[in-house]
Design a protein with these regions (language model features):
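A generic fold-level signal
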Residues: 4-5, 34, 61, 105-106
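Acidic active-site catalytic centers that drive phospho-/nucleotidyl reactions
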Residues: 15, 72, 115-117
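Short, conserved charged micro-motifs
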Residues: 18, 73-77
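Conserved short beta-strand elements that form part of the metal-binding/catalytic scaffold
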Residues: 30-64, 68-70, 88-89, 120-125
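Amphipathic alpha-helical segments
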Residues: 17-30
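N-terminal beta-strand motif that seeds the catalytic metal site of vicinal oxygen chelate
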Residues: 1-20, 64-66, 124-127
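A short, glycine- and basic residue-enriched loop/turn
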Residues: 10, 38-39, 110
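Vicinal oxygen chelate
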Residues: 2, 68, 78-127
């Protein structure tokens, strides 16, 4: 029924101006003309978008909320880090970052960062 429809990721922010600055200057997204009051809409690849709306509080999630697919994660992580994005570092039995990236056999490579509201964002390159 919805298999061929466009999809958007939706995040919440307590400060839309701060979020706009972060996603434009650090992540490199462009604000869409579809942006409406109390919302930010960023155009992403293949007709997808990221919507961020303003709210007084943000419920913190302990999982990835948005995942950007990458053809070259090493390059993308390097550029994001140069733009001031701070990556999460892991050293557990199941996850170990090397140069900000976790390699998962049979799956791919991932790197995670948090936006100013603590939303967890991933960059992912499949195997």
């Amino acid at each position: 029924m919805l298999a061929n429809n466009r999809v958007s990721a939706v995040l919440v922010s307590t400060d839309l101006e701060r979020s706009q600055e972060f996603y434009e200057s650090k992540v490199g997204l462009a604000l869409s003309p579809d942006t409406i009051k109390n919302h930010l809409v960023f155009e992403c690849g293949d007709g997808t978008s990221l919507l961020i709306y303003g709210r007084g509080t943000v419920n913190k999630a302990d999982h990835t909320q948005v995942r950007f697919w990458s053809d070259d994660i090493d390059k993308d992580v390097t550029v994001l880090a140069a733009n001031g994005v701070k990556f999460e570092e892991y050293d557990t039995q199941t996850f170990k970052t090397v140069d900000h990236i976790v390699t998962s056999a049979g799956i791919g490579r991932s790197a995670w960062f948090k936006d100013p509201d603590g939303n967890t964002i991933a960059v992912f390159q499949p195997e």
